[in-house]
Structures are given as C-alpha cells and as structure tokens.
Amino acid sequence: MKEYDIIIVGGGPIGLFATFYSGLRDMSALLIDAQDELGGQLVTIYPEKMVYDVGGYPGILAYDLAQNLIEQAKMFSPDIRLKEWVDWITRTQDNLWVIKTDKGNEFKAKTILLALGIGRITPSRLGAGGEIEYENRGVYYTVKRKKDFEEKRILIVGGGDSAVDWAINLAPVAKSITLIHRRDQFRAHESSVKQLYNIASVHTWHELKEVKGDGSKVTQAVIFDNRTKEEKTLDVDAVIISIGHKGDLGNVPRWGLNMKGRDILVNAKMETNLPGVYAAGDIASQEGVPKMALIAIGFSEAAIATSMAKKYIDPNVSIFGGHSSEIMKSRS
C-alpha cells in the first residue's frame, strides 16, 4: 500500500489549494473527493456566478476560479481520486492513518487534512410529479452553462438568493423567465427581489405540482396556488428547482473528532483532537473565533494546516517553508 505524507479529503477550493501547498512543501499527496469533478460548490452549485471576494480578482466566474485552482493543484502531480467517499479512518500501531472508502479501497498516510466543506453535495428535491423522470432533461438544480438556456422558457422554483440570482442572470439569454415561490416573502436580497419583478413573471404563494414532457424533454409545468389549490399549466422548456442543497457528512461524526454541530473543532494551528488530523475551510471551527465562510480565509487555513502537517511529519523543519518564489527558484 502506497504511503502518502498527507491525504486531503475534499476537492473544493480549500482542498485544491491545500493540495498545491502540500506540493510546495514537498509532501506527497492524495486528493480524494466524492463528486465526479473537482471544484466543490464552485462547480456544483454556482459555476456561472461571479466571485468577488478572492484576492487578486476584481471578479471571476466561479467555474473559471475552480479551473485555475485545479491547474494549480496539479502542479506537483498529486494522486487524485474522484467519485470516492471516505467512509472510515483508522490509526495504526506505527502512528499512521489508514482511510477506507465506500469502494473498499484503503490508503495510508502520515497525516490527514479534512477540507469537506458542507460534505457530499446533493440537491434538495421537491418530489413533484415528473421531477425525477426529467432530471437533466429539462429539470435542473443548478445552472452549469448559461448558453444551455438560451431562448428557453424557464420556470424557476424558489425564493432564496440562488433562485432570484439565476432569474436575473438568465433573463438576458432566456426567452422568458417565470419564478414561483411558496410564500410572499423572499429570503433573497431586497434589491435583487426588486430587480426580479422587472425581468420575470413572479407568482408568490405558488408551488410546483408536476413536470410534463414528451418523453425526451420538458414541455410543460403544472403549478398551483397553495391557498386556493387553483392550478395553472405553463408551457416551459426548462425547470430550475433552486431550494437549496444538502451536505452529507456520512460517518465523519463517528470518527472520534471533537465536533460542534456539523463543524469539526480545531485550534489556531488547524489541529483536531486526533494527532496528525487537521481541518480547514467551512467544516472547521475554532472556539471563540468568528466563523466566516469565505474562500480567502479557507486558503489561509489550508496553508496553516499543511504547514503544521509538514512539521508533524518532520519536527526539525520550519513551520514557514519560505516564500513561494524562493521555493520554486530553489527547485529549478
């Protein structure tokens, strides 16, 4: 069994940066993620949205940011495994960690970094008629490519920021936008809701009852007023159900980690209570420190965690390995 210096669990932006940084610190790394592509929420939930709070970018498309991070993560040739979920971790007698995946594979490492984000991401579904039948054939839970919705009659279900933002972002390319929400109050930002009413047909107190199609694509959607039960049939080409995503942590709460709710508790060094196991990003929380789910902060945590992992492996090395320009120059 190959032995790694570090196994990074989670292929979102924080896990990707940690993979790069571990390579910069001359650590052999395995990056493992449950999704079928790297990038985490950047590609799974909001690939077509702009990100403005990452240093060095006045604004960058989430998908493009993910691609840059993936390219950076691969600089030092880490091993990468996708569509594989870490089911269990075990400490060996020689103070190594063995992770076991849902596919029955086992991998050994000196240290582990948990960059799990919100966990394995799955969309929240309504359970409407025809929803599953037409999934990815007209029923969607996110927008991966705006061009796929050009000149489409689009029905959006939801009242949060994602639903309203998709309506606004797709309006310039869509043939028409209709948005339904089961209440008359929106969770989205007030200015966005005001803009929504200018670009879309909005039906409050309405829910989706059924999606209809011709067997290969969506052609209609049946909505109803949840107060009067009156139904309406809309001619549509696409239905976007934007009512949130669920994060599944699987067996993580049973690994012996100190946790608070869904968060893994760490100290200022990003160390968990398990020796050689670190956490960074949305999954990590420090007692007494305000939690800010920002990519920029996660990058810093990833650098600290990987540096502490390096120090754990070799107590004689400096925690700060030097500036990247100096490190790269020394390797050339």
Swiss-Prot record:
Binding positions for FAD per the UniProt entry: 33, 41, 46, 86, 121, 282, 325
Top-level EC class as recorded in UniProt: oxidoreductase
Reaction it catalyzes: 2 reduced [2Fe-2S]-[ferredoxin] + NADP(+) + H(+) = 2 oxidized [2Fe-2S]-[ferredoxin] + NADPH
Keyword Isomerase: no
Cofactor note: Binds 1 FAD per subunit.
GO molecular function list: ferredoxin-NADP+ reductase activity; flavin adenine dinucleotide binding; NADP binding
Alphabetic keyword roster: FAD, Flavoprotein, NADP, Oxidoreductase
Top-level taxon in the UniProt lineage: Archaea
Matching InterPro entries: FAD/NAD-bd_sf (IPR036188), FAD/NAD-binding_dom (IPR023753), Fd--NADP_Rdtase_type_2 (IPR022890), Ferredoxin-NADP_redctase_2 (IPR050097)
Keyword Flavoprotein: yes
Cofactor(s) needed by this chain: FAD
E.C. number: 1.18.1.2
Gene3D superfamilies, per database record: FAD/NAD(P)-binding domain
Similarity comment text for this entry: Belongs to the ferredoxin--NADP reductase type 2 family.
HAMAP family, per the entry: FENR2 (MF_01685)
Subunit structure, interactors included: Homodimer.
Name this protein carries in UniProt: Ferredoxin--NADP reductase 2
Taxonomic source organism: Sulfolobus acidocaldarius (strain ATCC 33909 / DSM 639 / JCM 8929 / NBRC 15157 / NCIMB 11770)
Species classification: Archaea, Thermoproteota, Thermoprotei, Sulfolobales, Sulfolobaceae
